Amino acid sequence: MITRLNIASIYVLDKDEALDFYVNKLGLEKGNDVRQGDYRWLTIRVPGGPGTEVSLEQPGLPLHDEATAAQLRELITKGALGGLVFNTDDAQGLYETLKERGVTDFTQEPTEHFYGTDMGLRDPFGNPIRILQQGKAG
């Protein structure tokens, strides 16, 4: 029986730039940062606990040949490889904080829906990110 999701992955074009964005702009924390030969295992996570980590993967060796890496880089910049959804207790407050931290690529300001308030943005590479303040069940 599966008991929880441990690690999910997203592709980025530069791991250091991604780490800076996710930690210093979004407020996440670095999880693992381990090098093994040419490979760098780098994860981020929501602060405060042993929850699901997000592995920041970069196209290229040793995981991909150059042709595959080139295709992945093109898909990343189109925002076509999936994305992330985070929860917050205060979507509007977080939106203001993100703007103060220099986040500019918002795809949607905080908007109320029947399920709660959410907003959209993209990381520096084009990956879509949704942030949801869930509404009351009813």
PLM feature segments, named:
Residues E17-A18, G93:
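Short Gly/charged-rich anion-binding patches and loops
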Residues S9-Y11:
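A conserved hydrophobic helix/loop-capping motif in glycosyltransferases and polysaccharide synthases
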Residues M1-I7, E29-F86, G93-P124, Q133-G138:
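Vicinal oxygen chelate
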Residues A18-V23, L98, G126:
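Conserved active-site tyrosine of GNAT-family acetyltransferases
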